[in-house]
Swiss-Prot record:
Membrane-spanning parts: none
Record-annotated disulphide pairs: none
Gene3D superfamilies the record matches: Jelly Rolls (2.60.120.10)
Membership in a protein family: Belongs to the Ves family.
NCBIfam families: PRK11396.1
A Pfam family hit: HutD
Protein name from the UniProt record: Protein Ves
Signal peptide coordinates: none
Name of the gene encoding the protein in the UniProt record: ves
Length: 191
């Protein structure tokens, strides 16, 4: 289990100067050729997403203005807050900010031939499935994960095991991404 606080994470500026990324975790850890990766991006200007052949990307707008995603003849999609949207990461996708507002989004990328991610918003206590990786990011409220208290802009990632996230207040939201391994693959094979 790895814990993080977005306010304390290192920031990598994009080459095109249109935004920045805070990498949460990759699996396998510290590998450039990852099977899955979670990150948070701040987007300050219109531009294209980086290409990642053989990967699927799920983007969830966390804050800021809506974002229009365009991919040639494939789709035009308005990304709205807390509504995950998946697309192939090997296609050119342009992001256009609405009303010139900076946006922040959560990204999970998975290698299509190895694993698949599912992203959802939780508003109550829940337990994750065993033997699956995952990431949680607190949008608001206070959540208990084991002996750790997680609050706004904090989270955790893990590579396997069952974990209970307990909401400690009447209301709260967190983003939860679960990694499912495809048949013939498991985290044990690559660690």
């Amino acid at each position: 289990m790895e814990y993080f606080d977005m306010r304390k994470m290192s920031v990598n500026l994009w080459r095109n100067a249109a935004g920045e990324t805070r990498e949460i975790c990759t699996f396998p850890p510290a590998k450039r050729d990852f099977y899955w990766r979670a990150s948070i991006a701040s987007i300050a200007a219109n531009g294209e997403f980086s290409l990642f052949p053989g990967m699927e990307r799920i983007v969830t707008l966390l804050e800021g203005g809506e974002m229009l995603l365009e991919s040639a003849d494939r789709f035009n999609h308005t990304l709205k807050p807390l509504q995950p949207f998946a697309f192939a990461a090997d296609q050119v996708v342009k992001a256009k900010l609405t009303a010139g507002q900076m946006s922040m989004d959560f990204n999970i990328m998975t290698r299509l031939d190895v694993c698949k991610a599912k992203v959802r918003i939780a508003e109550r206590t829940f337990t994750t499935f065993g033997s699956r990786g995952g990431v949680v990011f607190v949008i608001n409220g206070a959540w208990q994960l084991g002996d750790k208290l997680l609050t706004t802009d904090q989270g955790a990632c893990w590579f396997d095991g069952r974990h209970t996230l307990r909401l400690l207040q009447p209301q709260g939201k967190l983003l939860f991404s679960e990694i499912n391994w495809l048949a013939g693959h498991s985290p044990d094979q690559v660690q």
